Amino acid sequence: MKERIIQPVNSGLNGNITIPGDKSISHRAVMFGAIAEGKTTIKGFLPGADCLSTISCFKEMGVDIVQNGDEVTVVGKGLEGLQEPKAVLDVGNSGTTIRLMSGILANTPFFSCVQGDASIAKRPMKRVTNPLKQMGANIDGREEGTFTPLTIRGGDLKAIEYNSPVASAQVKSAILLAGLRAEGVTAVTEPHISRDHTERMLEAFGVKVTREGKTVKLAGGQKLTATDVQVPGDVSSAAFFLVAGAIIPNSKLVLENVGMNPTRTGIIDVLEKMGATFTVEPINEGASEPAANITIETSSLKGIEIGGDIIPRLIDEIPVIALAATQAEGITVIKDAHELKVKETNRIDTVVAELTKLGARIEATDDGMIIYGKSALKGNTVNSYGDHRIGMMLAIAGCIAEGKTIIEDAEAVGVSYPTFFEELQKLTK
Protein backbone atom coordinates (compact mmCIF):
# COMPACT_ATOMS: atom_id res chain seq x y z
CA MET A 1 0.00 0.00 0.00
CA LYS A 2 1.84 3.08 -1.26
CA GLU A 3 1.57 6.41 0.48
CA ARG A 4 2.16 9.98 -0.70
CA ILE A 5 3.28 12.95 1.33
CA ILE A 6 1.67 16.27 0.38
CA GLN A 7 3.24 19.49 1.61
CA PRO A 8 1.38 22.82 1.78
CA VAL A 9 1.53 24.87 -1.43
CA ASN A 10 2.44 28.39 -0.36
CA SER A 11 3.18 29.92 -3.77
CA GLY A 12 -0.04 28.72 -5.44
CA LEU A 13 -0.63 26.47 -8.44
CA ASN A 14 0.17 28.12 -11.75
CA GLY A 15 0.40 26.96 -15.36
CA ASN A 16 -1.35 25.07 -18.13
CA ILE A 17 -2.50 21.48 -17.85
CA THR A 18 -3.88 19.13 -20.50
CA ILE A 19 -6.54 16.98 -18.86
CA PRO A 20 -6.27 13.24 -19.67
CA GLY A 21 -8.96 11.57 -21.78
CA ASP A 22 -12.48 11.09 -20.49
CA LYS A 23 -12.85 7.73 -18.75
CA SER A 24 -16.51 7.21 -19.65
CA ILE A 25 -15.92 7.99 -23.34
CA SER A 26 -12.73 5.89 -23.49
CA HIS A 27 -14.58 2.81 -22.18
CA ARG A 28 -17.38 3.22 -24.69
CA ALA A 29 -15.08 3.87 -27.63
CA VAL A 30 -13.35 0.52 -27.07
CA MET A 31 -16.60 -1.40 -26.49
CA PHE A 32 -18.45 0.11 -29.43
CA GLY A 33 -15.42 -0.29 -31.67
CA ALA A 34 -15.30 -3.97 -30.69
CA ILE A 35 -18.93 -4.63 -31.71
CA ALA A 36 -18.79 -2.40 -34.80
CA GLU A 37 -17.92 -3.53 -38.31
CA GLY A 38 -14.58 -2.13 -39.47
CA LYS A 39 -11.58 -0.45 -37.86
CA THR A 40 -11.97 2.24 -35.18
CA THR A 41 -9.10 4.53 -34.21
CA ILE A 42 -9.36 6.23 -30.82
CA LYS A 43 -7.25 9.29 -30.01
CA GLY A 44 -7.04 10.84 -26.55
CA PHE A 45 -7.78 7.46 -24.90
CA LEU A 46 -7.30 7.33 -21.12
CA PRO A 47 -4.67 4.63 -20.39
CA GLY A 48 -5.82 4.26 -16.77
CA ALA A 49 -6.36 0.94 -15.03
CA ASP A 50 -10.15 0.90 -15.54
CA CYS A 51 -10.05 1.48 -19.30
CA LEU A 52 -7.23 -1.04 -19.70
CA SER A 53 -9.54 -3.59 -18.02
CA THR A 54 -12.08 -2.96 -20.79
CA ILE A 55 -9.42 -3.58 -23.45
CA SER A 56 -8.33 -6.78 -21.69
CA CYS A 57 -11.90 -8.15 -21.52
CA PHE A 58 -12.63 -7.58 -25.21
CA LYS A 59 -9.28 -9.03 -26.25
CA GLU A 60 -10.32 -12.12 -24.29
CA MET A 61 -13.37 -12.29 -26.58
CA GLY A 62 -11.22 -12.34 -29.71
CA VAL A 63 -11.15 -8.64 -30.61
CA ASP A 64 -7.91 -7.33 -32.13
CA ILE A 65 -6.99 -4.23 -30.10
CA VAL A 66 -3.67 -2.37 -30.21
CA GLN A 67 -3.03 0.29 -27.57
CA ASN A 68 -0.09 2.68 -27.71
CA GLY A 69 -0.34 5.32 -25.00
CA ASP A 70 -3.42 7.43 -25.69
CA GLU A 71 -4.04 5.98 -29.15
CA VAL A 72 -5.97 2.74 -29.64
CA THR A 73 -6.92 0.79 -32.76
CA VAL A 74 -9.87 -1.63 -32.55
CA VAL A 75 -10.71 -4.03 -35.38
CA GLY A 76 -14.40 -4.64 -34.79
CA LYS A 77 -16.03 -8.07 -34.89
CA GLY A 78 -19.60 -6.85 -35.35
CA LEU A 79 -22.39 -7.62 -32.91
CA GLU A 80 -22.30 -11.31 -33.77
CA GLY A 81 -18.53 -11.78 -33.97
CA LEU A 82 -17.47 -11.88 -30.32
CA GLN A 83 -16.06 -15.24 -29.21
CA GLU A 84 -16.76 -17.14 -26.01
CA PRO A 85 -13.97 -16.23 -23.56
CA LYS A 86 -11.80 -19.12 -22.40
CA ALA A 87 -11.07 -17.41 -19.07
CA VAL A 88 -12.99 -15.37 -16.52
CA LEU A 89 -13.46 -11.75 -17.67
CA ASP A 90 -11.75 -9.66 -14.98
CA VAL A 91 -12.91 -6.02 -14.82
CA GLY A 92 -10.53 -5.04 -12.01
CA ASN A 93 -11.97 -1.99 -10.23
CA SER A 94 -14.19 -0.89 -13.12
CA GLY A 95 -17.92 -0.63 -12.50
CA THR A 96 -18.41 0.84 -15.97
CA THR A 97 -16.78 -2.18 -17.60
CA ILE A 98 -18.85 -4.79 -15.80
CA ARG A 99 -22.19 -3.02 -16.14
CA LEU A 100 -21.94 -1.97 -19.80
CA MET A 101 -20.27 -5.21 -20.86
CA SER A 102 -23.09 -7.17 -19.18
CA GLY A 103 -25.49 -5.55 -21.65
CA ILE A 104 -23.34 -6.70 -24.57
CA LEU A 105 -22.85 -10.20 -23.11
CA ALA A 106 -26.61 -10.51 -22.57
CA ASN A 107 -27.16 -10.61 -26.32
CA THR A 108 -24.31 -13.00 -27.18
CA PRO A 109 -25.15 -16.71 -27.48
CA PHE A 110 -22.29 -17.98 -25.34
CA PHE A 111 -21.30 -18.45 -21.70
CA SER A 112 -19.19 -15.95 -19.79
CA CYS A 113 -18.17 -15.35 -16.20
CA VAL A 114 -17.37 -11.81 -15.04
CA GLN A 115 -15.71 -10.68 -11.83
CA GLY A 116 -13.61 -7.84 -10.43
CA ASP A 117 -11.69 -6.82 -7.34
CA ALA A 118 -12.89 -6.64 -3.72
CA SER A 119 -14.55 -3.26 -4.32
CA ILE A 120 -16.54 -4.57 -7.31
CA ALA A 121 -17.65 -7.55 -5.21
CA LYS A 122 -19.50 -5.11 -2.91
CA ARG A 123 -21.19 -3.03 -5.62
CA PRO A 124 -24.86 -3.67 -6.52
CA MET A 125 -25.36 -5.45 -9.84
CA LYS A 126 -29.07 -6.27 -9.54
CA ARG A 127 -29.97 -2.84 -10.94
CA VAL A 128 -28.42 -4.12 -14.20
CA THR A 129 -29.05 -7.86 -14.02
CA ASN A 130 -32.79 -7.55 -13.27
CA PRO A 131 -33.74 -5.66 -16.47
CA LEU A 132 -31.40 -7.87 -18.53
CA LYS A 133 -33.16 -10.95 -17.11
CA GLN A 134 -36.51 -9.36 -18.03
CA MET A 135 -35.22 -9.16 -21.60
CA GLY A 136 -34.49 -12.89 -21.55
CA ALA A 137 -30.82 -13.15 -20.59
CA ASN A 138 -29.76 -15.99 -18.32
CA ILE A 139 -27.73 -14.32 -15.55
CA ASP A 140 -26.73 -15.55 -12.12
CA GLY A 141 -24.42 -14.44 -9.34
CA ARG A 142 -24.12 -14.24 -5.59
CA GLU A 143 -27.45 -13.50 -3.90
CA GLU A 144 -29.43 -14.09 -7.10
CA GLY A 145 -27.33 -11.85 -9.28
CA THR A 146 -26.93 -9.05 -6.74
CA PHE A 147 -23.14 -9.37 -6.51
CA THR A 148 -20.20 -10.68 -8.52
CA PRO A 149 -19.02 -13.01 -9.83
CA LEU A 150 -21.72 -13.01 -12.50
CA THR A 151 -22.36 -15.78 -14.99
CA ILE A 152 -24.08 -14.76 -18.20
CA ARG A 153 -25.47 -16.87 -21.01
CA GLY A 154 -26.94 -14.53 -23.56
CA GLY A 155 -29.23 -15.26 -26.44
CA ASP A 156 -32.49 -14.19 -28.01
CA LEU A 157 -33.72 -11.10 -26.20
CA LYS A 158 -37.01 -9.25 -26.29
CA ALA A 159 -37.16 -5.46 -25.98
CA ILE A 160 -38.56 -3.95 -22.79
CA GLU A 161 -39.81 -0.56 -21.67
CA TYR A 162 -37.94 -0.04 -18.43
CA ASN A 163 -38.58 2.57 -15.75
CA SER A 164 -35.26 2.83 -13.92
CA PRO A 165 -35.53 3.61 -10.20
CA VAL A 166 -32.16 5.40 -10.38
CA ALA A 167 -30.66 7.94 -12.76
CA SER A 168 -27.69 5.82 -13.81
CA ALA A 169 -25.91 5.99 -17.15
CA GLN A 170 -24.52 2.52 -16.50
CA VAL A 171 -27.97 0.97 -16.05
CA LYS A 172 -29.36 2.84 -19.06
CA SER A 173 -26.37 1.89 -21.22
CA ALA A 174 -26.48 -1.81 -20.32
CA ILE A 175 -30.15 -2.02 -21.34
CA LEU A 176 -29.63 -0.09 -24.58
CA LEU A 177 -26.62 -2.24 -25.54
CA ALA A 178 -28.66 -5.39 -24.88
CA GLY A 179 -31.42 -3.84 -26.99
CA LEU A 180 -29.17 -3.69 -30.06
CA ARG A 181 -29.95 -7.37 -30.76
CA ALA A 182 -33.35 -7.56 -29.05
CA GLU A 183 -36.64 -8.04 -30.87
CA GLY A 184 -38.59 -4.77 -30.83
CA VAL A 185 -37.93 -1.28 -29.49
CA THR A 186 -36.10 -0.98 -26.16
CA ALA A 187 -36.92 2.08 -24.03
CA VAL A 188 -35.38 3.32 -20.77
CA THR A 189 -36.97 6.07 -18.65
CA GLU A 190 -35.05 7.66 -15.75
CA PRO A 191 -36.13 9.84 -12.81
CA HIS A 192 -33.50 12.41 -13.88
CA ILE A 193 -31.46 12.55 -17.10
CA SER A 194 -28.09 10.83 -16.57
CA ARG A 195 -24.94 11.32 -18.64
CA ASP A 196 -25.58 10.63 -22.32
CA HIS A 197 -22.22 9.48 -23.70
CA THR A 198 -23.75 6.17 -24.82
CA GLU A 199 -26.50 7.83 -26.86
CA ARG A 200 -24.07 10.26 -28.49
CA MET A 201 -21.55 7.56 -29.36
CA LEU A 202 -24.13 5.08 -30.64
CA GLU A 203 -25.30 7.80 -33.02
CA ALA A 204 -21.69 8.42 -34.10
CA PHE A 205 -21.43 4.68 -34.87
CA GLY A 206 -24.56 4.87 -37.04
CA VAL A 207 -27.27 3.70 -34.63
CA LYS A 208 -30.59 5.58 -34.62
CA VAL A 209 -31.43 6.61 -31.05
CA THR A 210 -34.61 8.48 -30.09
CA ARG A 211 -34.70 10.79 -27.07
CA GLU A 212 -37.97 12.05 -25.61
CA GLY A 213 -37.54 13.91 -22.32
CA LYS A 214 -36.24 11.40 -19.77
CA THR A 215 -36.80 8.42 -22.12
CA VAL A 216 -34.30 6.94 -24.59
CA LYS A 217 -35.32 4.38 -27.24
CA LEU A 218 -33.64 2.26 -29.89
CA ALA A 219 -34.85 -0.47 -32.22
CA GLY A 220 -33.16 -3.86 -32.28
CA GLY A 221 -31.37 -5.18 -35.34
CA GLN A 222 -29.20 -2.11 -35.94
CA LYS A 223 -25.51 -2.50 -36.75
CA LEU A 224 -22.60 -0.32 -35.67
CA THR A 225 -20.24 1.02 -38.33
CA ALA A 226 -16.67 1.78 -37.26
CA THR A 227 -15.73 5.43 -36.88
CA ASP A 228 -12.77 7.34 -35.48
CA VAL A 229 -13.19 8.80 -31.99
CA GLN A 230 -11.48 11.86 -30.51
CA VAL A 231 -11.77 11.69 -26.72
CA PRO A 232 -11.87 15.07 -24.90
CA GLY A 233 -10.36 15.57 -21.45
CA ASP A 234 -12.30 14.18 -18.49
CA VAL A 235 -14.25 16.89 -16.65
CA SER A 236 -14.30 14.64 -13.56
CA SER A 237 -10.48 14.69 -13.52
CA ALA A 238 -10.45 18.41 -14.33
CA ALA A 239 -12.66 19.01 -11.28
CA PHE A 240 -9.75 18.46 -8.89
CA PHE A 241 -7.68 21.18 -10.52
CA LEU A 242 -10.70 23.47 -10.92
CA VAL A 243 -11.24 23.33 -7.17
CA ALA A 244 -7.49 23.55 -6.50
CA GLY A 245 -7.27 26.71 -8.61
CA ALA A 246 -10.18 28.23 -6.71
CA ILE A 247 -9.13 27.43 -3.12
CA ILE A 248 -5.30 27.50 -3.12
CA PRO A 249 -4.09 31.09 -2.63
CA ASN A 250 -2.11 32.77 -5.45
CA SER A 251 -3.27 30.27 -8.09
CA LYS A 252 -4.15 30.63 -11.75
CA LEU A 253 -4.62 27.55 -13.93
CA VAL A 254 -5.53 26.97 -17.57
CA LEU A 255 -7.14 23.54 -18.08
CA GLU A 256 -6.98 22.53 -21.73
CA ASN A 257 -9.38 20.32 -23.70
CA VAL A 258 -11.95 19.73 -20.93
CA GLY A 259 -15.04 17.76 -21.99
CA MET A 260 -18.14 19.94 -21.71
CA ASN A 261 -20.93 17.44 -22.27
CA PRO A 262 -23.95 19.20 -20.68
CA THR A 263 -24.89 16.05 -18.74
CA ARG A 264 -21.49 16.27 -16.98
CA THR A 265 -20.95 19.98 -16.29
CA GLY A 266 -22.67 20.24 -12.92
CA ILE A 267 -19.28 21.06 -11.36
CA ILE A 268 -19.07 24.18 -13.57
CA ASP A 269 -22.55 25.30 -12.49
CA VAL A 270 -21.74 24.72 -8.82
CA LEU A 271 -18.45 26.65 -8.93
CA GLU A 272 -20.23 29.53 -10.65
CA LYS A 273 -22.95 29.54 -7.98
CA MET A 274 -20.30 29.46 -5.24
CA GLY A 275 -18.68 32.56 -6.75
CA ALA A 276 -15.55 31.10 -8.38
CA THR A 277 -13.65 33.28 -10.87
CA PHE A 278 -13.24 31.41 -14.16
CA THR A 279 -13.73 31.63 -17.93
CA VAL A 280 -14.76 28.93 -20.42
CA GLU A 281 -13.51 29.06 -24.02
CA PRO A 282 -15.17 26.47 -26.34
CA ILE A 283 -12.67 24.83 -28.73
CA ASN A 284 -14.57 22.31 -30.86
CA GLU A 285 -18.12 23.57 -31.34
CA GLY A 286 -20.20 21.17 -33.41
CA ALA A 287 -18.39 18.02 -32.23
CA SER A 288 -20.51 15.22 -30.78
CA GLU A 289 -18.63 15.68 -27.49
CA PRO A 290 -17.93 19.40 -26.89
CA ALA A 291 -14.74 20.60 -25.17
CA ALA A 292 -13.31 23.86 -23.86
CA ASN A 293 -10.29 25.48 -22.26
CA ILE A 294 -11.05 26.71 -18.74
CA THR A 295 -9.08 29.37 -16.86
CA ILE A 296 -9.63 29.54 -13.10
CA GLU A 297 -8.00 31.54 -10.33
CA THR A 298 -8.11 31.88 -6.57
CA SER A 299 -11.64 32.86 -5.55
CA SER A 300 -13.77 33.78 -2.55
CA LEU A 301 -16.41 31.05 -2.33
CA LYS A 302 -19.74 30.99 -0.53
CA GLY A 303 -21.79 28.04 0.72
CA ILE A 304 -24.77 26.86 -1.35
CA GLU A 305 -27.39 24.08 -1.47
CA ILE A 306 -26.87 21.30 -4.03
CA GLY A 307 -29.59 18.75 -4.87
CA GLY A 308 -32.23 17.56 -7.32
CA ASP A 309 -31.66 17.29 -11.07
CA ILE A 310 -28.06 18.50 -10.90
CA ILE A 311 -26.85 15.51 -8.84
CA PRO A 312 -26.46 13.05 -11.77
CA ARG A 313 -24.47 15.78 -13.57
CA LEU A 314 -21.85 15.95 -10.79
CA ILE A 315 -22.11 12.72 -8.79
CA ASP A 316 -18.41 11.88 -9.22
CA GLU A 317 -17.31 15.41 -8.34
CA ILE A 318 -19.05 15.57 -4.95
CA PRO A 319 -15.92 14.60 -2.94
CA VAL A 320 -13.96 17.57 -4.29
CA ILE A 321 -17.03 19.86 -4.12
CA ALA A 322 -17.17 18.98 -0.40
CA LEU A 323 -13.55 20.08 -0.10
CA ALA A 324 -14.35 23.38 -1.85
CA ALA A 325 -17.20 23.86 0.61
CA THR A 326 -14.80 23.63 3.57
CA GLN A 327 -13.16 26.79 2.20
CA ALA A 328 -16.43 28.62 1.45
CA GLU A 329 -18.07 31.15 3.75
CA GLY A 330 -21.25 29.73 5.25
CA ILE A 331 -22.98 26.36 5.07
CA THR A 332 -23.11 24.02 2.07
CA VAL A 333 -25.80 21.32 1.97
CA ILE A 334 -25.50 18.39 -0.46
CA LYS A 335 -28.64 16.23 -0.72
CA ASP A 336 -30.32 13.65 -3.03
CA ALA A 337 -26.93 11.95 -3.45
CA HIS A 338 -27.79 8.40 -2.28
CA GLU A 339 -25.72 7.01 -5.20
CA LEU A 340 -22.54 8.04 -3.37
CA LYS A 341 -23.08 5.04 -1.10
CA VAL A 342 -22.51 2.53 -3.93
CA LYS A 343 -19.36 3.95 -5.51
CA GLU A 344 -15.83 2.54 -5.01
CA THR A 345 -16.39 3.38 -1.35
CA ASN A 346 -19.39 4.76 0.49
CA ARG A 347 -18.34 8.25 -0.50
CA ILE A 348 -20.60 9.97 2.00
CA ASP A 349 -18.94 8.24 4.94
CA THR A 350 -15.43 8.32 3.46
CA VAL A 351 -15.47 12.02 2.57
CA VAL A 352 -16.81 12.96 5.99
CA ALA A 353 -14.35 10.74 7.88
CA GLU A 354 -11.23 11.81 5.98
CA LEU A 355 -11.99 15.54 5.84
CA THR A 356 -12.82 15.44 9.56
CA LYS A 357 -9.30 14.07 10.19
CA LEU A 358 -7.98 17.22 8.50
CA GLY A 359 -10.06 19.50 10.71
CA ALA A 360 -13.08 20.16 8.50
CA ARG A 361 -16.48 20.69 10.10
CA ILE A 362 -18.62 18.28 8.12
CA GLU A 363 -21.39 15.82 8.94
CA ALA A 364 -23.03 12.98 7.05
CA THR A 365 -26.74 12.83 6.27
CA ASP A 366 -28.72 9.94 4.82
CA ASP A 367 -28.43 11.29 1.28
CA GLY A 368 -25.45 13.63 1.40
CA MET A 369 -23.58 15.90 3.78
CA ILE A 370 -23.53 19.30 5.45
CA ILE A 371 -20.29 21.30 5.39
CA TYR A 372 -19.67 24.27 7.67
CA GLY A 373 -17.17 26.75 6.22
CA LYS A 374 -14.71 28.21 6.45
CA SER A 375 -12.31 25.70 8.08
CA ALA A 376 -8.54 25.90 8.49
CA LEU A 377 -7.29 22.40 7.61
CA LYS A 378 -4.36 20.72 9.39
CA GLY A 379 -2.21 17.95 7.96
CA ASN A 380 -2.80 14.39 9.14
CA THR A 381 -2.63 10.80 7.92
CA VAL A 382 -5.61 10.00 5.70
CA ASN A 383 -6.61 7.11 3.44
CA SER A 384 -8.16 6.81 -0.03
CA TYR A 385 -9.49 3.32 0.80
CA GLY A 386 -8.75 2.37 -2.80
CA ASP A 387 -11.03 5.10 -4.19
CA HIS A 388 -9.30 7.21 -6.86
CA ARG A 389 -11.53 10.25 -6.40
CA ILE A 390 -11.04 10.25 -2.63
CA GLY A 391 -7.26 10.04 -3.12
CA MET A 392 -7.14 13.04 -5.46
CA MET A 393 -9.49 15.10 -3.29
CA LEU A 394 -7.25 14.47 -0.27
CA ALA A 395 -4.17 15.52 -2.25
CA ILE A 396 -5.75 18.90 -3.04
CA ALA A 397 -6.80 19.19 0.61
CA GLY A 398 -3.19 18.58 1.61
CA CYS A 399 -2.10 21.53 -0.51
CA ILE A 400 -4.03 23.94 1.73
CA ALA A 401 -3.51 22.15 5.06
CA GLU A 402 -1.02 23.35 7.66
CA GLY A 403 1.82 20.84 7.88
CA LYS A 404 2.27 17.65 5.88
CA THR A 405 -0.54 15.32 4.86
CA ILE A 406 0.14 11.61 4.34
CA ILE A 407 -2.23 9.80 1.96
CA GLU A 408 -2.31 6.02 2.36
CA ASP A 409 -3.30 3.84 -0.62
CA ALA A 410 -2.46 6.77 -2.89
CA GLU A 411 -1.84 4.60 -5.97
CA ALA A 412 -5.63 4.30 -6.37
CA VAL A 413 -5.53 7.53 -8.42
CA GLY A 414 -4.11 5.48 -11.32
CA VAL A 415 -7.61 4.18 -12.03
CA SER A 416 -8.56 7.45 -13.76
CA TYR A 417 -5.55 9.79 -13.63
CA PRO A 418 -2.20 7.94 -13.72
CA THR A 419 -0.13 11.17 -13.95
CA PHE A 420 -2.07 13.12 -11.31
CA PHE A 421 0.72 13.51 -8.75
CA GLU A 422 3.28 14.41 -11.42
CA GLU A 423 0.96 17.10 -12.82
CA LEU A 424 0.33 18.48 -9.34
CA GLN A 425 4.08 18.65 -8.72
CA LYS A 426 4.70 20.52 -12.00
CA LEU A 427 2.14 23.19 -11.17
CA THR A 428 3.75 23.98 -7.81
CA LYS A 429 7.08 25.04 -9.37
Curated annotation (Swiss-Prot):
One of its GO terms (cellular component) is cytoplasm. Its main location: cytoplasm. Coiled coil: none annotated. 3-phosphoshikimate binds at K23, S24, R28, S168, Q170, D316, K343. It catalyses: 3-phosphoshikimate + phosphoenolpyruvate = 5-O-(1-carboxyvinyl)-3-phosphoshikimate + phosphate. It comes from the Bacteria. One of its GO terms (molecular function) is 3-phosphoshikimate 1-carboxyvinyltransferase activity. Catalyzes the transfer of the enolpyruvyl moiety of phosphoenolpyruvate (PEP) to the 5-hydroxyl of shikimate-3-phosphate (S3P) to produce enolpyruvyl shikimate-3-phosphate and inorganic phosphate. This is 3-phosphoshikimate 1-carboxyvinyltransferase. It comes from Bacillus thuringiensis (strain Al Hakam). The lineage of its organism: Bacteria, Bacillati, Bacillota, Bacilli, Bacillales. The gene is aroA.
